[in-house]
Amino acid sequence: AARAAICSNDGSTGEGAGGADMTTKESGDAAETRALAHLQAQGLTLVQRNYRVARGPNARGGEVDLILRERDGTLVFVEVRQRRSAGHGGAAASIGLAKQQRIVYAASCYLRTLRATPPCRFDVVAIDGDRIEWLRAAFDAG
């Protein structure tokens, strides 16, 4: 029961309530939509969008922007990052260790919902201005 509570999906679809963050959220949603279209054009199939794990007293929470499946069955957990320019290292450089750990945690919770664990990897789609870069196996769970 403790594991279920720690890894409980918060049921959110990522839809916000608006307010001051609406512009940022809309921009993020648009980036995810662009990334998804790019990956689907490469043959990947969407499994789930915005998979979230709720925070709890002893849980850090986390989110995976996109979960897709390769033709060979590999499950791909994708973090989408967008920056208007490549200053400060660009979009890919903005994913620090703490963010990677939250993505890995959410992915591990998602994997626990499956009967069998398929091969998986962690990709990043970096959107810098008009440029989209797909970084396969950008980081690992270790």
Summary of predicted features, one role per range:
Residues 130-142:
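Short, low-complexity, polybasic intrinsically disordered segments
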